[in-house]
Amino acid sequence: MKVLGIYGSPRKGGNSDLLLQEALKGAEAAGAACSTLRPFKMDISGCMECGACDKTGICIIKDDMQAIYPQLEEASIIFVATPMFFYGMPSDLKALIDRCQALWSKRMITKSPERRKTYDRGSGYMLAVGATKGANLFEGAHLVARYFFDALDMSYDGSVCVNKVEGKGDI
């Protein structure tokens, strides 16, 4: 089984990183082959909404996403770890997610209507932390995660969301 962990924070060793490291330790202990991505260290342009992927299922932007797409498609389980920045995900992580419109388009082009919403490819999970105690802190992130995993034909099977965590290592 392949497990992919996506570090959404630009702060290495921060609270969301610590959550993801623990999740990956558990996956490795269960025999999974784990790999990770750090979008903030990669060349990932935002989606241009050019519509090319709507016709072909392939994004025409040439950057690090071309190497990321196969990793996303091969993983059985994906963990997305993210801090909350103004009630949302950091921009580098969000750019990666937005660029998965190509994978959603690919699925819609290549699968029959009855197979388009089977979510039979695997499971996705979100690990999120934020400093504020706001009641709606994670609502937007849950929606983004749900539709990110939908684009990958994966079910969104759960989350760990921790608020009132501000300083590095406070979790």
Model regions and ranges:
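Glycine-rich phosphate/pyrophosphate-binding loop and the adjoining helix
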Residues: 1, 29-30, 135-171
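N-terminal beta1-alpha1 ligand-phosphate binding loop
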Residues: 1-32
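A structural signal for isolated positions on well-ordered beta-strands in alpha/beta enzyme cores
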Residues: 2-4, 35, 125, 157-158
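Residue-level recognition of beta-strand->loop/alpha-helix junctions
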Residues: 7, 38, 160-161
